[in-house]
From Swiss-Prot:
Lineage of the organism: Bacteria, Bacillati, Bacillota, Bacilli, Bacillales
Species of origin: Listeria monocytogenes serovar 1/2a (strain ATCC BAA-679 / EGD-e)
EC number per UniProt: 3.1.21.2
Protein name in UniProt: Probable endonuclease 4
GO terms, molecular function: deoxyribonuclease IV (phage-T4-induced) activity; DNA binding; DNA-(apurinic or apyrimidinic site) endonuclease activity; phosphoric diester hydrolase activity; zinc ion binding
Catalytic activity, reaction form: Endonucleolytic cleavage to 5'-phosphooligonucleotide end-products
Amino acid sequence: MLRLGSHVSMSGKKMLLGASEEAASYGSNTFMIYTGAPQNTRRKPIEELNIEAGLEHMKAHDMADIVVHAPYIINIGNSVKPETFELGVNFLQSEIERTRALGAKQIVLHPGAHVGEGADKGIKQIIQGLNEALIHDQDVQIALETMAGKGSECGRTFEELAQIIDGVTHNELLSVTFDTCHTHDAGYDIVNDFDGVLNQFDKIVGIDRLKVLHINDSKNERGAHKDRHANIGFGHIGFDALHYIVHHPQLADVPKILETPYVGGDKASKKAPYKWEIAMLKNGEFDPDLLNKIQNS
């Protein structure tokens, strides 16, 4: 069954219930959340996440396979500052606990940045961090994200992800998030040869590890190593390629999450595009006037 949704907000008093309500308003049947602000470690206690009411709403609206995204401040690739590494490991463990409490099975993680020490050192540090953070009997997988390769990011190739996975003791607890914008920006030709890229991924990492898809267009040409998301059909990947990926038979059971930019000039008037983009990906017809329609809605 096609599970298609977007990033939604989990905040205020409603928390998980509010996230599910927002997702339902977009015509989604899955969604992705941060457990709090992605740029800090301030988090509400689990009992204040309004989980019971949220799960009831999800059940009533056929929401399933929801995904949690770990915050950007976690960098377990940092071998220069021990305090940054330690914070990353400890906070990742507490985020795994929140993910489990929310009933999600996947927590998306940017593998980490080597901060100038080189990819090999960064990957070694990430392996150490994951070995420390993972508890062998947990039922949550860390879904390492394919990265664009901007700055000192690790995980910019399938080989780097495989290297991390191979080094982790309990690697049955690792999966992969395939981000279309990142993979395109990293240099993979998902526009003209997605099947070839998927076969390559299968040979190097294993398609059985692909548990989350981030569906984003890209503002940049292939191989730019930039990571700038564009609205569906309005970037260098294009609608046809993204529609093909969303409906790919080998990925039928993988939840697909949109992280495309809000539409509008100033912050106050920006609007979420997800209701329109989800409808477009379902019906298979690109609307070149979509951004104007969203702005004027």
